[in-house]
Regions:
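N-terminal Rossmann-like FAD-binding beta1-loop-alpha1 element of flavoenzymes
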Residues: 152-172
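Ferredoxin-type iron-sulfur electron-transfer modules and their immediate structural context
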Residues: 2-152
Length: 172
């Protein structure tokens, strides 16, 4: 831990990432507060503009769900937060949950090219920003389920894999 802190303190600050939790992160239930609050709109914009938008982005390969990270980050940087959420949720129907629980520091953020010299892009917080944006506004970014075709499927288990499978099958 101490070595990690020393390394992060020695990194150049020219590409310092903003870490300004929004006012929404303040909860009336202090024991229920999240450890890392959401980014404000301004902080999300600044953070997204730090991205290098790599051609063969290692963050995509490091993501277990294969989310196109540079695309959704670029959409946030251009103000298309709804489009960013669509990119995320099309690849991973549980993108809003994963933004909170996925160990991004060892997956996509751990693979971030920018992380070699500076702090990596806060991909998890940007993902959370985009998915929270559409959820808070009641915006539906996914296509409606396909019409019934007469086939029925039973999925055993209601964990992430079962829910993801059900969503994919409903689109067929």
């Amino acid at each position: 831990k101490n070595q990690r802190r020393i390394l992060s303190e020695s990194k150049p600050s020219a590409m310092a990432r903003p870490n300004q939790p929004s006012a929404e992160s303040q909860s009336q239930f202090p024991l229920m507060e999240e450890i890392r609050g959401p980014l404000s709109d301004r902080a999300a914009l600044a953070e997204s503009q730090r991205c290098l938008y790599c051609y063969d982005a290692p963050c995509i390969h490091a993501c277990p769900t294969g989310i196109d990270v540079p695309t959704f980050v670029k959409k946030i940087s251009t103000g298309d937060v709804t489009g960013a959420a669509k990119t995320i949720l099309t690849a991973n129907i549980l993108g809003a949950s994963c933004a909170r629980v996925c160990p991004t520091e060892v997956l996509c953020e751990g693979a971030c090219v920018l992380g070699h010299e500076y702090d990596p892009i806060q991909i998890g917080l940007l993902q959370r920003h985009a998915t929270d944006f559409v959820t808070a506004r009641g915006i539906s970014v996914l296509d409606s389920p396909a019409k019934a075709n007469g086939f029925r499927v039973a999925i055993i288990g209601a964990g992430p894999a079962g829910l993801g499978c059900a969503a994919d099958l409903a689109a067929l």
